[in-house]
């Protein structure tokens, strides 16, 4: 999940030039960003497009996406009149509440001048360097969305339900996320078989 990489109040970043600095963005904000991606499965632009008015306590309504400085409908054409809806699970609720201001309105993730936070900038200046220090590769915001799909699939959630959570227009789009999962499960199964065969071979040798 990577939330533990940003467990403090502030973040210390080690630059490639040997510099060490503390970015303006708080650790709590980065945790909330990751949680929205991982627990709600929102796309990059949809995360940027969230307003506090979209937070309805037990659900997020998805009305807009932000690309660069442009506010537009989401990839699946959700908007003010026909918003998408994603349940807010307890871990996400806690992390959103941690950054919620007293009079919450406007962007959930604002930048310093009142616009939508630039996730690409945060990724390059903050997240990637922290990942690197811990020996991890950044796979992109989409990886959290795919991870959510994978985890739901492993829990036995029907494809159509996962489709609704990820807000895909077609269930076939959802199912394509499981190609990797199926291969990983197959590899794991074959490794277990390999270990079993090794044990059987050892027993056979002892008998002989």
Residue ranges and their predicted role:
Residues 141-142, 178:
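Catalytic tyrosine of NAD(P)H-dependent dehydrogenase/reductases that use a Tyr as the general acid/base
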Residues 6-21, 68-92, 98, 102-104, ...:
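C-terminal secondary-structure termini that scaffold catalytic or DNA-interacting sites
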Residues 32-35, 39-46, 121-122, 129, ...:
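C-terminal catalytic core of tyrosine-transesterase DNA break-rejoin enzymes
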Residues 3, 63, 89, 110-111, ...:
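Residue-level detector of conserved, well-ordered beta-strand and adjacent loop positions
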Residues 100-101, 132, 153-157, 167-170, ...:
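Hydrophobic alpha-helix feature that most strongly marks membrane-spanning transmembrane helices
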Residues 53-61, 138, 157-176:
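Short, polar N-cap/turn motifs at the start of nucleic acid-interacting alpha helices
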Residues 1-44, 48-50, 79-83, 102, ...:
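Basic, Lys/Arg- and aromatic-enriched nucleic-acid-binding interface segment
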